[in-house]
Amino acid sequence: MGSLGSSQLKPFNKAPIDFVSTKRQPGAVCSLPELVDYNAQHNASHNFCIQGKPGGEFDTFTHADFKVAAANCAKWLKANLPLGASQAPNAITKNAPVALFMESDFGLVVHEFALLSLGIPPLVLSVRLPPNAIMHLLKSTGATSFIVSQKLSGPAKPALAALAANGIATAVGNPYTSFLEPGVDVASKGTFEVPENPDDITLLLHSSGTTGLPKPIPISHRMLMFAVSTAKFDTEDEAQGLNVSSLPLFHGFGLVAPGISMTVGKTTVYPASDGIPNIVSIIDLIKRTNARSLMTVPFLLDDVINNEEGLRVLAGLDFVGTGGAALGPGVGDKLAAAGIKLLNFYGTTESGPLSLVFVPKDNYNWKFFRLRTDMNFEIANLEPKDGVKRYRLTIRAFGEGEDQEIADQLIRNDEYPETDFAAVGRDDDVIVLATGEKASPQILENMLTEAPMVKAAIAFGENQFNLGVIVEPKEPLAEGGEAAFKELIWPIIVAAGQKMDAHSVIPSQEAVIVVPNGVRVPRTDKGSIARKEVYALFADAMKDVYEKLARAVGGADLKPLDLETLEEDIKALIIEHSGLKVPAEGLSAEESLFDFGLDSLQALKLRRVLAAAANKSEAMKDVNVDKVIPPEFVYLNPSVAQMAAAIKNPSAGSAAPTVDANAYKGVEKFAEQYALPGASAEEKAPSVRERAIVVVTGSSGSLGSHVVATLARDPKVMRVVVMVRQGSKPFDREPWTSRGINLKEDEFAKIVPLPVDPTAENLGVDPMMYGMLQNNLTHIVHAAWPMNYLTTLPSFQYQFEYLSGLLKLATSGNTANKRRFIFVSSIAAVARLSLSNSGAMISETPVEPVDAACGIGYADGKLVCEKILEKAAVSHAGQLEIAYVRCGQMTGSRATGAWNADEQIPMIFRTAKNLGVLPRIPGTLSWIPVDDAAQYIMDLSFFEGALPIASHLENPVRQSWADLMDGAGKFLGIQKSVSWPEWLELAGAAEDGPQDKYPVKKLFAFFKFSFGPMASGAVILGTDVARAHSATIKNMGALDASTIMKYFLHWQKINYL
């Protein structure tokens, strides 16, 4: 084996690599097994890698050692596994793959290259994949064998048994030491077999699976050779300096480090695999090996900004490269200011690394990646955004084959306009339904376009109650073949629906539009779908879809409603058409359908069936059924009895819906289902007040963004870890700048983005990063919550899973101190208490679900979370300090006037301006500026002493609505005013115009039945506890006229008013 301490520069003989030619050229190296052989012969004594070991020791391996280990491992594989040709139908590999489930170290590299040398494609699995994802990948690739490392074999025993039962051979891999033969002549191992076709698939990686199950990503010999040829150094000294890499080897970027070791001689140093690397251990590793560069994940670098020694060590390196996720701009700026030469890596698993690995010099800007020039690519112009030009990258790495268009939108560095770019967003669209729920169409579109009979699929449904999809057949259909084509693709659509949220499911084949023969789906010059143009082309067809869905529900056999037997008729419709699995005898007239699991899509379908049956009724022939049974009908009348009453007496629809007497059952059920399991007798020290590391959710919202800013400005806070959804747009300052929040560079540097999947195991966080959180976080502020007043309680289960996942994180890890957990609840959770008690003030205490639950999903969902937290505060009292904060009406910022235009109050004023009429809202209001609200969260997070389990965030000083409307009328130039009910009728009757002129209509049921009581003083929150724990609330007064004026000026500035 090689020597770690050798500092003498050895000449490295670079192989004549060819990834461009489709056919093998004489003397060229066209595959990784050939490259291993080349280096074993020409660079035998040059170090391939250095593997860290527990206790600070190292193993050093030359290229000759690597060849010997791979050859011996290949021999072991042939003796212990049933290797052979793929038997799977539609196989993408000639030979059946072998899965590798191993920790990221030299042992994984040895097994991977041993399989490559045998022509057996390794399927390299991430160690954080759950069992169902692993089984999916094994089946979809036709893998016949599964190798697990010794370290992981214990936890994997149940899974191994399941694999064996499915006919997959399993084996525990040997440690890499068993494959070494010190002193053996490398020539005795012969040479590996040379692949005939450079385009054969030789390696299988996989996607992250953030939008469903992970999919296998096939990599050919040429693609691999392209991937490892990404380095460009000016001197041998730059090329051969040791390179520490903590990038996981089972990800695409993990191949870069061993790749450049084989192509330019840059020896890789791997951390010990006995634990999760942290920045302290990485810095120590760099110092002990005299490494010259570092490749790592952004999260590790987030931890170095307050480590003076770490900054000094990293500043002495040739470069520090990051890939796989975005480095927070504030962190990057601070590292660059410390003299660290940051290098931005860019690429996709499918394309391979598209950026150069080099030593940054001169005025290279770390925020941009430097594009490789050894491939074919084109840069196309896109529509500018916010005055900044945007671009699209299309590559054809090898000069032939199909173009590969990268989904990211790019901006360019004007100093290096041909090569330096940054990714600023993706094309992935989210469709907002009429309920306010957000539907992500990617799973549906991807599964359809992957089908052999489909050329393109485009989902639609903006401001509708469900999605539809436009499908372009791959081949022209026979005359009259549309119905048969829909039948053919319908199982795919159903399968996609099983992986999507209930509200995203395609309801029937009526919602499928088949592109006619001769009609071309609009595309950009580079072949991507031009979504806006598609919607314009098929506007009439999409309109017909929703009209058909409304008309054709139930078919000709649907019986008309009979007012004499109305409850029985409605019950029969529910049993037959809703999709609920409930027997007729089990459905009482008084129980809420949502207690039986009715989801938003089923509610929509049931409303359509009821409307269709009502339209057939002789007794209702002169009635406007759409007004009697509006889109929100089932939400407002969730039981059979309530529906019957509302249909028999339509005038009662002007009154608020009655409270569902059984709503508390759903709250208690979910509170029990998602409670933090177990109990802990451990008693830790009180939570810390200094050097805090705070996890925050909901940072894209108004309160969340201000909480993050307030924390970042406080010297007690060392780091703010912002949880963002996986697949969301790149992290930048936009959530703060759009609200007028200015952060200094050192403040912004504290903010660290962390992509999560709220419903996945360990929140979908990489094990290394999750381990760091377990051992370092001190506080959690959970502010994420969807603003949707029509969603049912069962639809909030993913939020309960999110809370459960955060509580599990908060109670894990080895820390000496308790952790504080602050949850942002709502006035809605307890509003019923005041409404049913003549406006009595609500005290800051826990409430009973039987008294507070109201049947509105948004409100009852918050109540479920309160009950989950109350249980955790008792069962884990020695580990957690828990508080929830019920928030009243928050306004925009006191400092800047920035107030989100999509909130209730701005909606009222925009609608009023376009109507030319103001509403007269009775009573008083209690408004608290969002920056004051954020300061209260801060006060509570670091309060000296025991936390109150419940407190209220509301302005203790109330103001008159009449005074506010007088001022608003003068600003808007509106003199006319009518009562609140009359104004709502005007808004509801207004014709929809362009640009969302009457936004109140979007949430009409909420404004009609819920807004008034909570906004006008019928629901008043006590604030004694809050005032006792916060000077911010204690000293708060009424909002002055100048502050209120700032809000109107802000809405005017952004062209909302």
Curated annotation (Swiss-Prot):
**Keyword ATP-binding assigned:** yes
Chain sites annotated for binding AMP = H251, N344, F345, T349, A423, V424, G425, R426
A molecular-function term among this protein's GO annotations = oxidoreductase activity
Entry keyword Transferase: no
The UniProt annotation puts the region (Adenylation (A) domain) at 21-378
Q: Which residues carry this modification: O-(pantetheine 4'-phosphoryl)serine?
A: S600
For biological process, the GO terms are:
terpenoid biosynthetic process
Q: Which reaction does it catalyse?
A: ilicicolinate B + AH2 + ATP = ilicicolin B + A + AMP + diphosphate
- Looking at its record, which EC class is this enzyme? oxidoreductase
A family per Pfam: NAD_binding_4
Q: Name the residues that bind NADP(+).
A: S700, G701, S702, L703, A783, A784, W785, Y858, K862
- Top-level taxon: Eukaryota
Catalytic activity, EC: 1.2.1.-
Question: Which pathway is recorded for this entry?
Answer: Secondary metabolite biosynthesis; terpenoid biosynthesis
Q: Which residues form the Carrier domain?
A: 564-651
Question: What role does it play?
Answer: Nonribosomal peptide synthase-like protein; part of the cluster that mediates the biosynthesis of LL-Z1272-beta, also known as ilicicolin B, a prenylated aryl-aldehyde produced by several fungi and that serves as a key pathway intermediate for many fungal meroterpenoids. The first step in the pathway is performed by the non-reducing polyketide synthase stbA that produces orsellinic acid by condensing acetyl-CoA with 3 malonyl-CoA units. The prenyltransferase stbC then prenylates orsenilic acid into grifolic acid. Finally, grifolic acid is reduced to ilicicolin B by the NRPS-like protein stbB.
Comment, domains:
Contains three distinct domains: an adenylation (A) domain that activates the substrate amino acid which is subsequently covalently linked as a thioester (aminoacyl-S-PCP) to the 4'-phosphopantetheine prosthetic group of the second domain, the peptidyl carrier protein (PCP) domain, as well as a reductase (R) release domain.
What is stated as this protein's family in its record?
Belongs to the adenylate-forming reductase family.
- For this entry, the protein name equals Adenylate-forming reductase stbB
Q: Which organism is it from?
A: Stachybotrys bisbyi (Hyalostachybotrys bisbyi)
The encoding gene: stbB
